[in-house]
């Protein structure tokens, strides 16, 4: 995908990435982490994303930075997912917004860039208690 992204740094384990959002509210450290999970004999990675909270050394996935760089942040996360899958090509990644509004934002971003994404990744959504191949005309 040919979108404007932030430079990011990979942590040693390749399971963590960091970059900085820059805008009217300053420079804010963002973290993307892939955490291995196991369910019903399947291993997958949960994608966690948010602002780094220096006070408690945790990712805050409900923070609102308002740096007017949402699309650049989402493109950076997409680039990180592609980087991660280049190291683990057959991996399953689970991602869900921390709020319904964020989940919807991610769905819209997938739909807008669907032509390119569909060539690179298999994307599924969970709807009506089943997994379905993502289709840009449906909400999940």
Question: Where do the protein language model's features map onto the residues?
Answer:
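Non-catalytic substrate-recognition and accessory regions of acyl/acetyltransferase enzymes
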Residues: 1-140
């Amino acid at each position: 995908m040919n979108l404007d992204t932030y430079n990011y740094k990979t942590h040693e384990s390749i399971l963590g990435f960091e970059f900085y959002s820059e805008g009217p509210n300053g420079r804010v450290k963002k973290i993307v982490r892939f955490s291995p999970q196991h369910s019903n004999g399947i291993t997958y990675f949960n994608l966690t994303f948010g602002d780094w909270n220096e006070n408690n050394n945790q990712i805050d996935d409900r923070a609102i930075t308002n740096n007017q760089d949402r699309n650049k942040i989402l493109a950076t996360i997409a680039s990180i997912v592609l980087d991660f899958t280049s190291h683990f090509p057959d991996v399953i990644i689970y991602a869900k917004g921390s709020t319904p509004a964020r989940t919807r934002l991610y769905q819209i971003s997938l739909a807008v860039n669907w032509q390119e994404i569909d060539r690179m990744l298999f994307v599924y959504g969970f709807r009506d208690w089943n997994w379905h191949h993502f289709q840009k005309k449906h909400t999940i």
